[in-house]
Amino acid sequence: MRKTLKRAAALLSAATLALSLAACGTPASSETSSESSASATAAPASTAAPEASDASTSTGTPKYIFLFIGDGMSYPQIQSTNYYLSALENGTSMGGDGAILEHEDALSFIDFPVAGSAQTYDSTSFCPDSASTATSISTGHKTYSGTINMDETGTVSYETIAEKLKDQLGYKIGVVSSVNLNHATPAAFYCHQVSRNSYYEIGLEMIESEFDYFAGGALLQPTGAEEDQDDLYELAADAGYTVARTQADAEALGADSGKAVVISEQLADGDSIPYELDREEGTWALSDYVSKGIEMLEGDDGFFMMVEGGKIDWACHANDAGSTLADTEALSDAVDVAIDFYNEHPDETLILVTGDHETGGLTIGYAGTNYDTFLQNLSNQKISYAKFDTDYVASYKENGTSFEEVLDDVAELFGLTTEEAAGQAAEDGVVTDSADSHPSGVTSGSLVMTDYELDLLEDAYNMTMTKTDETELSQEEYILYGSYEPLSVTITHILNNKSGIDFSSYSHTGLPVAVYAMGAGQELFEGYYDNTDIYFNLAELTGVE
């Protein structure tokens, strides 16, 4: 359900200031920060603030700052999720003027009063990674892929916006992620490492940061890569953190609990929070960790909270559109919590929603469906690819399950069926086709697999049942399966394509990311700019140096 936004005061203030500036003949652009010029690296970035920067003081300095980062989330993930939600609500992904933006279940941030775009390249590639892009967002500097908050030489470290807000202004700091707390994006707000894979060292820096609230997935390598180091959780407790590893313990935390590390009681692939499709009823969603963070951080000193929807990226790497859309919606639900807080403190709160890069090369449109989409088909997917791997594929391998038996599970869990099974379902009165309405191509929305698709699935089944860790994939096999379980990724590929969407990669792409802003200083984030400017805009708004 969408939240009502109290935006009138902010918009009126911005308009009043704009008129005043016009009357006074004030220049549209502001002088570039001196720190901006110091950020030049082997791949120089544009660090000039957008023209709207002159309006940055229109609503004052934000006392409460929320920075939501959808890892791997760019325009395709946002738009496909919003279209999908519209299709579920209206029976079609189309509608009248503004219907996609205005429908009741639209993403909570999609019509924030200010929207911008940020380019994402790093010093290595136009297709950057999370370590370097999060470094750009948190410090205003470009660096190599895989490096966190250090320069290309690995000798100069950069102080993050979170560290500066804590040290210079006394803000409380929260870091929340649906993946591991020492993964690249959350780490980029508190650590400084040449390699994002130095998980134990990153964990040590997490403890040394003395940030107030960490919440999300478990720490990777908590006793070191060789499992011979002091346990990070014990070190955190020794440093004064309350380590909550059950939901009951997390629920018991409050404003007077002091520093806390909260680990999801229900852990899934890679010791992360489960995909939203797999989350058990009654267990915390990303939004619940944000709610608890507000409870623990709110106070006279102000706070900064970074919230990462990290499983969006993981789902896109695996080309799992159903999980991608569900986790993008989960991020939107977390933003809803911040909107509720904003509505209580509209003059003191800034909410930013962005991505670090795009993952997977997701597209709305597929050659096999021409101009049509059948997005409701994705609602037939009941679990993520990861849960299918652990709960089903592992059993298939162990028990030698036949292809015919596997097809029964595919129909139950993903809606994909054979012509024979679909005929029986029709006799039983079961309807599985998309209800999206289109002027043509209705039959192409069917969930009945063609002979071509069925052959692809059987080939993938055979590969899954016979391959070992030593199996080397051919170029053709890699393009078909990437590094994923052939059966699982082929199922999601077929369902994606029958829904009218597709992926072009198992890696990151070079698309710009959206930046949505609402609240104090929102005008700074309008326009097209570099991702480093997100840092410089926050620094300008808060006055940190």
Language-model segment annotations:
Residues G25-A28:
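Bacterial signal peptide processing site
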Residues L19-A23:
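C-terminal motif of bacterial Sec signal peptides marking the signal peptidase cleavage site
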Residues M1-L12:
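Bacterial N-terminal signal peptides that target proteins for export
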Residues A45, T59-T81, I137-K166, Y171-A188, ...:
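Mobile, glycine-rich extracellular loop/lid and propeptide segments
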Residues T57, A99-L101, S177:
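PP2C/PPM-type serine/threonine phosphatase catalytic domain
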Residues P62-Y64, M73-I78, N82-T135, H183-E545:
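A post-motif C-terminal structural segment
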Residues T41, T47, S177, T349, ...:
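Ser/Thr-centric signal marking residues that sit
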Residues S30-S56:
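Extracellular mucin-like PTS domains
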